[in-house]
From Swiss-Prot:
Name of the protein: Putative uncharacterized protein DDB_G0284425
Subcellular localization: Membrane
GO CC aspect terms: membrane
Keywords per UniProt: Membrane, Transmembrane, Transmembrane helix
Main localization category: membrane
Chain ranges passing through the membrane: 59-79
Organism listed in the record: Dictyostelium discoideum (Social amoeba)
Topology versus the membrane: Single-pass type IV membrane protein
């Protein structure tokens, strides 16, 4: 009987430790949710829609170069 009693006590201690770990995990997950909300607040307007600054800079460079090429063709037609 004593053997089973000691095993049950060990199991009870293990269950209590697991419950404490679960509480810590829930707090950690809650903190990560707060961090996610803070990151969303810190994002720029374009990043909120899923467009990063690198893509925007590529688009701007493309528009500038394309406009320059169109401008050169336009000038060459009237000379």
């Amino acid at each position: 009987m004593d053997k089973y009693k000691s095993i049950n006590e060990k199991l009870d201690i293990k269950i209590e430790e697991d419950e404490e770990n679960d509480i810590g995990f829930k707090e950690e997950r809650y903190n990560s949710q707060q961090e996610d909300e803070q990151l969303k607040k810190d994002l720029t307007i374009c990043e909120r829609f899923g467009v990063d600054s690198c893509l925007i800079s590529r688009i701007i460079i493309f528009v500038v170069i394309f406009s320059w090429i169109i401008f050169i063709f336009y000038i060459s037609l009237f000379e």
